[in-house]
Amino acid sequence: MEKLYVEGNKILNGHVIISGSKNAALPILFMTILTEGKIKIGNIPNLTDINIALKLLVYLGVKITGNETLCIDASSINIFCPPYNLINKIRASIWILGPLLARFGKAKIFLPGGCKIGSRPIDLHLNGLTQLGATINLKNNCIDAYVKGRLQGKYILMEKISVGATITIMSAATLAKGSTIIDNAACEPEIVDIAKFLNTLGADIIGAGSNKICIKGVLKLTGGTHQVIPDRIETGTFLVAAAASQGHITCHKTEPKHLTNVLMKLTEAGAKIKTGKDWIKLDMRGKRPKSLNICTAPYPGFPTDMQAQFALLNSISKGIGTITETIFENRFIYTSELIRMGAKIKIKNNTIICCGIPKLISSNVFSSDLRASATLILAGCIAAGITIVNHTYHLVRGYESFPKKLNKIGANIKII
């Protein structure tokens, strides 16, 4: 998927079924390396990043069958250096390192790829593994890691909150000798889901979801069954789609408690919101949204992966709104494309200032990353005229059947 034709002036109404969380599914797939037992994992989204992860696992010797529910057997792993052409495609491939080290005592991987959003250093991953006793050499863009015997449990104080590094350390510590404490850990729902999965296999992890996670190392893990949590970012994206178009939507198979900050901001913008056990209903019919002031922050704060979508919302809202990005630098590239569509946006350091206008205009735009792709497609849906969104190959990395789902609620999107 390279280029999309998006018809504008659409009001988006209807029902959407939310897919499994990419940000939980990817690390969980790599965590299967930790055990010889047979595993079943359900609610796996059909995404290019997921498919690349599966190819990586198969290359290592993992046996995988199924589609949305996968049966995985990692008992026959016999390769410890995945190929560059796969590693380079997704940044999540760094999560292979901890499980290989913990179970086999060795791993060699090239520096990973993925979305180009500023600087995303892996120092915290490597420092954590070093503190657990691993020897790590970094040369020619390749990480060569090994440990004699088992990794050793340790108290680890994270220099800064990092979801990725928390996952790496937690997975490696699962099979370490002794206990590990991760202080200043990330608290995201995906961390909780990964810990739940590992505990299902026999790990001893408590505290996931707080800033202090305690892992008591075990000798080995067994098999088990797990259901991946819903994708909170996909949910938030569809809620913004309805809000920005002055429509109404019900998101099914989702988890409202994972979106507290997003729902608060949508309510502040004027949306009527109702929630149930696994659904969220938003109604913005006949109302132009009110502008919002937002600051991204680690969970339970406002998610960085939703700031582009809310920048779109601010662009067509009443008043002047601001969004301050505190997680990643260089994450405002998409704003130049919204400006091309008529948005009045100024950037000041790590803050964007949006002066809302009633209507965007169609244009030929280019997406720079995953969330920018979704945002520009939504912008095309509500703008006047026909918008062409280029470089949408990013989209299938993190949204399952996004154009198809939008078309079901009133959009008219075609692959060119």
Swiss-Prot record:
It holds the Pfam family EPSP_synthase. UDP-N-acetyl-alpha-D-glucosamine binds at residues 91, 120-124, 305, 327. It is an enzyme of class 2 (transferase). Phosphoenolpyruvate binds at residues 22-23. GO terms for molecular function: UDP-N-acetylglucosamine 1-carboxyvinyltransferase activity. The active site is at 115 (proton donor). It is found in: Cytoplasm. Pathway: Cell wall biogenesis; peptidoglycan biosynthesis. InterPro entries: Enolpyruvate_Tfrase_dom, Enolpyruvate_Tfrase_sf, MurA_subfamily, RNA3'P_cycl/enolpyr_Trfase_a/b, UDP_GlcNAc_COvinyl_MurA. Its EC number is 2.5.1.7. Cell wall formation. Adds enolpyruvyl to UDP-N-acetylglucosamine. Belongs to the EPSP synthase family. MurA subfamily. This is UDP-N-acetylglucosamine 1-carboxyvinyltransferase. The gene is murA.
